[in-house]
Amino acid sequence: MSTRLGMDDTEQIYVRPANSKYIKYGRPRNDILLRVIENKDEEVKKDIGNIPFWIMRQAGRYLPEYMEIRKKYSFIEICNNPELSSEVSIMPFKRFGCDMVVIFSDILIIFVAMGIDLKFVDNIGPILNKEIYNMNDFQKLNVDVKKVINNMYYVYDSINITKGKLNNDVPILGFVGSPFTLFTYLTKNNKKTYEHSLKFIYEHKTDTHTILNVLSNICINHLINQIDSGANVIQIFDSNADIVSKNMYKEFSLYYLKKVINIVKKNRPDVFIILFIKDNFHEDIKNLHIDVLSITHKQLEEKTSSFYYNLFQNKIIIQGALDPHILLIDDMNLVQKYTSKMLDQIVHKNKYIANLGHGILPNSKIDNVHAFIQTIRGVKNRLPLESG
């Protein structure tokens, strides 16, 4: 594998000196989500209590209060302003009492730190001002880890500010896109599909691995600096895992996920790691040093929760997996029924975090979110329905 650009499989950890100025906090007051994750290696019958929940993209366009902020500021302007980002991050907690606050940011912020202008266009998505067709294009970007991390200071400031505003009430989630998902966005070249990304992989296999290695080192350092800023839990989003075959996924994603996870765990062993792999599966995920596996509604229906628990020998927490489209419907009672059906499919409720199968949609109804939460709150996670 090529190691040009000075990147290889060795650790290259950079911690911002400014991190030492952050206030250090202890364990959050509401630690139900952390206690569930800590139950990963315990017997399945251990009683935890309520089922914890949070919602992917829980601070977003479905919230009226967020849309008021958006009248004044763009998405990127909010991300770049630690005070605004913190304010938006807390909105869902104030409204719904979520068991974890997600810092308001985006997986593509890394590209901005690498020297790419990024904008989000409604109904289109992210637009990058630079296109990557070959290695020469990539080498023009800023790939120096120290510079990239320092350029993302506002993410780390926002995490620490949010922790203070919350009085350390609940855990904070930091996150990153997987190296593979970042690669696909980087080489998508603003097209609707990922044909350019796949073409790049087939045409420039060695260069693909070089780029993935660079992105892995940036991801590792971004996660470690989020943890040092106050994140209790981190999630890795492999949101584009479904665009490649099982074997390609193993080569171009799992290898780099393992690298990121192992190095983060080695350097910050107390952090909990959630992995979200969208609609792809390879049995080698069982060898990843993760605490939580976040699944989609499709994965829950196709494989069942028992399959995933058994794959990890019951030493895993499952997260998910309501279809986000259910929160668009006009009947709260139906939302509750679908949520109950989902909960019935989770065999070990004391090894479970309730969530959606993917990010909440912009047109989701607030009442439906309440119905989703109320249904979850009505179920205890004491005993499995069946031994999986």
Indicate where each model-derived feature is located.
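Catalytic-face loop-and-helix region of soluble metabolic enzyme cores
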Residues: 262-386
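N-terminal basic, low-complexity leaders that serve as flexible interaction/assembly modules and, when applicable
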Residues: 4-122, 259, 344, 366-385
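Conserved, mostly hydrophobic/aromatic
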Residues: 52, 93, 162, 219, ...
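Short, well-ordered coil/turn segments that N-cap beta-strands
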Residues: 44-51, 96-100, 166-172, 230-232, ...
